[in-house]
Curated annotation (Swiss-Prot):
Family as reported in the entry's similarity comment: Belongs to the IlvD/Edd family.
Residues where N6-carboxylysine is found: K121
Reactions that this protein is recorded to catalyse: (2R)-2,3-dihydroxy-3-methylbutanoate = 3-methyl-2-oxobutanoate + H2O; (2R,3R)-2,3-dihydroxy-3-methylpentanoate = (S)-3-methyl-2-oxopentanoate + H2O
InterPro entries: Dihydro-acid_dehy_C, DihydroxyA_deHydtase, DiOHA_6PGluconate_deHydtase_CS, ILV_EDD_C, ILV_EDD_N, IlvD/EDD_N
Cofactor note: Binds 1 [2Fe-2S] cluster per subunit. This cluster acts as a Lewis acid cofactor.
Essential cofactor(s): [2Fe-2S] cluster; Mg(2+)
Active site per UniProt: S476
Descriptive protein name: Dihydroxy-acid dehydratase
BP GO terms, sorted: isoleucine biosynthetic process; L-valine biosynthetic process
Residues that coordinate or bind Mg(2+): D78, D120, K121, E450
GO function terms (MF aspect): 2 iron, 2 sulfur cluster binding; dihydroxy-acid dehydratase activity; magnesium ion binding
E.C. code: 4.2.1.9
Keywords: 2Fe-2S, Amino-acid biosynthesis, Branched-chain amino acid biosynthesis, Iron, Iron-sulfur, Lyase, Magnesium, Metal-binding
Amino acid sequence: MRSDEVKKGWHRAPHRSLFRATGLKDEDFEKPFIGVANSFIEIIPGHFFLNKYAEIVKDEIRKNGCVPFEFNTIGVDDGIAMGHDGMLYSLPSREIIANSIETVMNAHKLDALICIPNCDKITPGMVMGALRVNVPSIFVTGGPMRAGHMPDGTPIDLATVFEGVGKFEKGEIDEETLYNLECLACPGGGSCSGMFTANSMNTLIEAMGIALKGNGTVLALTPEREELLRAAARRICEIAKDEQLTEQYRIKNIINEKAIHNAFVVDMAMGGSSNTVLHMMAIAKEADVDFDLHKLNEIARHTSHIAKISPSLQTVHMEDIHRAGGMSAVMKEISRRSDTILYLDNPVIEGGTVADRIKDAEVKDPEVIHPIENPYSKVGGLAILFGNLAEEGCVIKTAGITGERKFRGKAVCFNSQQEAIEGITSGKIKKGDVVVIRYEGPKGGPGMQEMLAPTSLIMGMGLGSDVALITDGRFSGATRGLSIGHVSPEAAEGGMIGLLKDGDIIEIDVDNFSINVDLTPEEIEKRKKEFTPIKKEVPGKWLKQYRMLVTNASNGAVLRAE
């Protein structure tokens, strides 16, 4: 066992002495040591109950002949950090989480890992950290929140509240309606109920095989979710106690190139958050998988979009996907397409393959999970656009487009999200404009803020089908409309988005994966020579360190290690 390095032999007497101080007995030094990476934090609705979940996991680990050691990571609630400089810290928190997993697991030579994340950057951060350690690892998340309902029964969620602010600004709803939205949208614990970033990532870790069947859709705070916790704990013990299984189920043996492909296939089929591209590129790098962004458009061409969930379809939430058969039903339906790129032979953590996991699955509600013969679209719900405005690519959630997929309009440029919010609310944006929000990339922000407030204002003001928005920042999973993010190179590194001027004509063609500004090569070269990027003042020391080390979005916004 890996943990023998800290517990076996006469020279480890001091180490054992410290372990005994925590309550370990002689017999415990013969057992595998299991790290329980929790992310309990009281301020996040998807995490305030995870302390109880960790107790369930640890109890099951002890019952199954192993020794659990719980430790915690930090967490940021993107919804609460939204719309102010707190959002600068959201994406950087992913790197702290990854570093903390790597640090605790390697410093103490733990044999295996069970991770309990749920929201936003916490799930991908834990996956990245687990890949660095490369021991057997199993993920069991806190689970999705139930959808909220208005007094008339209309289903709502957090995205409805954000858009409600825009409607209130425009005078379309009164203060009482906005208050009802605020009070009823989030009825209890769990990751926000739509296909936002948290639930997108939690379905993708199930698709990759490092979480058990049902992980992405079983609701939080239910007996079914508690049994999932116990099953995950039993399985990690079974693996850790067997030398052959320990080698077989190292996390890099599961998250390989096929698993990355499978994650993106499922992402396309369900129209997941555009943030998944950022996180999956980072995960691919940690897994030593060379994944080119151009591959996503190829995957999109071979993947039907068969499930729409809020914010793409506001009446459907994660509980509906679970009722309709869950992720296994989605994957089985995808596999029926003759040219699918879903790899059914890849391993899953419970043993066997993807094919074994989904063989008995069935779609129980074809209105929620459409049959492959009747998809929402024959191409996937995400696309990567390239052109002179984004030579290294940018991302759009095609599943959320509410208007035309081809757009030509005049640029209205803002050098920060706050500038954009002020411009939108003051009436500066009109039909046919392209809102450009720059210096919000990983380096320029720094921290790559989410642009949910500007996009929600645009939707709430009734301009969602008539205005495009492009940014080197990113979007909340709750964003919809013609919203294009992750523009690379970003403005802070001299990207074309930084050279744009008000009135420049921007052409977007989603179906041909292109985005360009209508300027001559001579004019572009002239602007490059005259260009000096803006460098923002930022609070604290961590963001300054982050800005020095972070790569752009096309590289997953990971930190340079060399």
